[in-house]
Amino acid sequence: MDNRVIEGRKMYHLDEKQIQEITDYIFLEDKLEKADAIFIPGCARPEHTEEAARLYKDGYAPLLLPSGGLFQGSFQGVSKEGQKYGADFACEADFLEAVLIQNGVPASAILKECEATYTLENAEKTKVLLEKKDIHLKKAILCCKAHHSRRSYLYYSMVFPEIEILV
């Protein structure tokens, strides 16, 4: 392993096998199957929500569950890529809902949660919402950013141990 010090910091060289092992751990991708719902953790970018809309239209799940509230007291706004869906949203879930609707998902298929401020809360507050609505899931698809997949999967699996979760 070729290690160097750059600007006072030790740098590590990883070989291809090590890089692949890290990649395989961080990035999850299951073979998708039909499910009861699609979990959509909050984000100011539209891409993973556009993918969730495509999965809905392809018949993978009848219910979409976007989750996301405020960060530091307010929704910080959408990314440059997300501005095509509008710019004035009270919370992340409102933005995600707009992305879904503008991509052909009917409002009746969306059940949003507008309080979560981080990934674990996305899962916890979505569970509370489902319990209030007396909705019981057996299988769900977790639709999130690729680099966020392992962390999201771990949190959602912890909060929903009774549900099979596909990423």
Language-model regions: role of each:
Residues 2-167:
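A structural signal for short, hydrophobic/glycine-enriched beta-strand patches
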